[in-house]
Amino acid sequence: MNYIYPVNQVDIIKASDFQSQEISSLEDVVSAKYSDIKMDTDIQVSQIMEMVSNPESLNPESLAKLQTTLSNYSIGVSLAGTLARKTVSAVETLLKS
């Protein structure tokens, strides 16, 4: 998952047209999306660990790529945390009313 590049408007439209017979509640949708984010971050962690453990990773190109990958990972984890907080806040607001 690459967070630096802008999101395509077509992707947003496709995401808004999301219809599935399996997912029927807000809880299921949120759970499915967070599990997708978890899988993506697990993949990124394994890629980062692979890059760090590679003895050839000390050249400038590899270090620049590692820095970009770490930056994308950090942005993704921060975004997931923010979205989780916002989701919890929205659910609490709905439950109060």
From Swiss-Prot:
Keywords: Plasmid, Protein transport, Transport, Virulence. GO terms for biological process: protein transport. The keyword Transport applies. It comes from the Bacteria. InterPro entries: T3SS_SctI-like. To S.typhimurium PrgJ. NCBIfam families: T3SS_SctI (NF038054). Necessary for the secretion of IPA invasins. This is Protein MxiI. It comes from Shigella flexneri.
